[in-house]
Amino acid sequence: MTVDELWQARAAAWELAALSLRYPGSELAEAAAGGEWDEAAGEILAALGLPAEVPAAAGDPAGPPAARAADTAGPAGADALLRALRPEATRLFVGAPEPACSPYEGVWAAEADGVQPLLFVNPRSMEVERFMRSCGLGRPEGTNEPLDHVATECELLERLALRAAGAPASEGAPDGAGLPGGSPAAAYGRFLSGHAQAWMPAFAERLAAEARHPFYRAAAAYLEALLAD
């Protein structure tokens, strides 16, 4: 594998992680129901040399693979899976009154420091926002989602990996020398070690423990394996 191919594999890895940890949509449900998610996760981890046991994303994890595929394949299976994933994602990541597994780095940092977490205005969230803006990634217009959401952090790593593989900068993003550390690879390494690896392993562990649907146990195992790269 060439250096560019390695970065392309990393970009694909974080793209799948971001898709998996956003609020579920039809793209995710179709991929998980049809088996494409399982195939992609296995191929990506193998390409990166990260052996891991990732459970099946859909169906009865104890049942035979053929039966799981038959139960979930096709539009009806994807629709049923989406109806199951959305309330589970809400319970896990939004909660009432508290999420079972907060998806925000700032909340995890505050918890580690023993202080009350505040979205947006806590020091870690503000640090993440500054880093992302320095890479050309800001909050989408008309939204108020904090940028330290796990899926957004995965998206940043995907973008930096693509830049390291030779992709051009998106509109409004600095050139390579203008990124933190002076290059896409350096910015990727800084964010991975300084942010993602600082809190996502604990997030993945709690997600695996709290998840009631097989998909989120699979997503947790995949993320945990990816963080070892």
Language-model segments: what does each one mean?
Residues 1-229:
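Surface/interface-facing alpha-helical segments and adjacent flexible terminal/loop regions used
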